[in-house]
Structures are given as C-alpha cells and as structure tokens.
Amino acid sequence: MSNKNVNVRKSQEITFCLLAGILMFMAMMVAGRAEAGVALGATRVIYPAGQKQEQLAVTNNDENSTYLIQSWVENADGVKDGRFIVTPPLFAMKGKKENTLRILDATNNQLPQDRESLFWMNVKAIPSMDKSKLTENTLQLAIISRIKLYYRPAKLALPPDQAAEKLRFRRSANSLTLINPTPYYLTVTELNAGTRVLENALVPPMGESTVKLPSDAGSNITYRTINDYGALTPKMTGVME
C-alpha cells in the first residue's frame, strides 16, 4: 500500500474518531441536561372513559434555567391528534417549579369501547438562552419526553392486573408471536427464550406482535410486563398455543 493511501486511511480514521467523540459528548450533555432539567411525573397516562380530565405533573429540577414547555398528543401513528386536548399547551417554567398539565377528552365517545386505544403524550422542553451570550457556535437543544397515553373504556371484560398472565405464544423457525386475547395493551419486557434475550414488544389488545427468534433459542419462554404504574410485574412462564 502506498504512503498516500496509508495517509488517507489514517485521516479517515482520525475523522471518524473525532466525530464519534463529538456525538458521545453531545449525548452525555443531553442526558445530563434531561436529568437536571424537566421531568414528568409518570411514565404513562391511563385515561379512564367518562373522566373529565387527567393530570400530568411537570417539574423543572434545574434551579438556574427557565424552559418553554410545549405539549401535545399524537395518535398511535405519531400524527398530532385533537381528540385529546392538553392545557396549557405552551408556557414558561422557571427553575425549581412544578406545573400540572391537564389532558381533556374530546373524543365524543368515538373510540372503541371494547378495548384500549393508544395515543402518545409529548412534552417538549426548550431551554431559554441569554442573548448576550449567544454566538454563532451556540447549540440549543430541545428535549422531548414522549410517553404512552391509554384511553381505557369502562367495564372491560377483565381487570388490568390479570391481563399479563393471559398472554400466549406461538413459535416458528425464526420468530416468536405474542398473542394478546385481552382488551389491554401489554408492554412485554425481559422476554427470554431459554438463555437468549429477545426484543421488547408492545402487543395490542386482541392482537399479535412478532419478535425475531435466534436459531439457538431455548424452548422455555419467560417474560415480564410493565403495569399501569410503570413497575415490572413478576416473571411469568410463557404458555404456547
């Protein structure tokens, strides 16, 4: 290999390392800012049918920063949806303060009443900047917190705490299908086939979700789910169809 090619390759490696370092630094800065900045009071919102409103707490843990808070709801496909209204939709939040978002039902009973419906609650935190300190190289990062919002009809056929144990499984050569016969969304985590860890899955009510299955995966299926409070349920053994 010529010296010219060696130098080009070294230059490319140095550039790649620099870019990787910059991206890692930015990720650390964002993570630190998110931890010190704005936090939500829940990991999911359950909206019972017939309720006038549901509340979500928002806290600014950063004593020295003011944030502009913007909130909205999206449907399951990630498109803004007016069937739930968030108020206030936009407000300024000073350091060490807490505010409450009110989520209002504007669905007019048009959603299915035999199962849950999935939406996404979005809260964007935009940090304020001192204009006197701004330069051409200033990078302003807005952080969006996105959590599930479940619309839950009244009088569903099964209590929510019994749904996880009803999950069933169907295995093929290279995939595992999770079958949910209940009216609730099931967030499945710590899914294992023998000693192989499989990907997490969100299984819709009265529906299915499929995950990849390694060729050397064992036959014993175990899993846990996340309940209404964001906590893990006890480990369960999968029942095959």
Curated annotation (Swiss-Prot):
- Tell me the first and last residues of the signal peptide: 1-36
Location(s), subcellular: Periplasm
A Pfam family the protein falls into: PapD_C
Which GO-annotated molecular functions does the record name?
Answer: protein folding chaperone
SUPFAM superfamilies according to UniProt: PapD-like (SSF49354), Periplasmic chaperone C-domain (SSF49584)
Q: Which GO terms describe its cellular component?
A: outer membrane-bounded periplasmic space
Instruction: For this UniProt record, give its keywords in alphabetical order, as a comma-separated list.
Output: Chaperone, Fimbrium biogenesis, Immunoglobulin domain, Periplasm, Signal
Gene Ontology biological process: cell wall organization; chaperone-mediated protein folding
Q: What does this protein do?
A: Required for the biogenesis of type 1 fimbriae. Binds and interact with FimH.
* Record-stated family: Belongs to the periplasmic pilus chaperone family.
Which named protein is this? Chaperone protein FimC
User: Which gene name does the record give?
Assistant: fimC
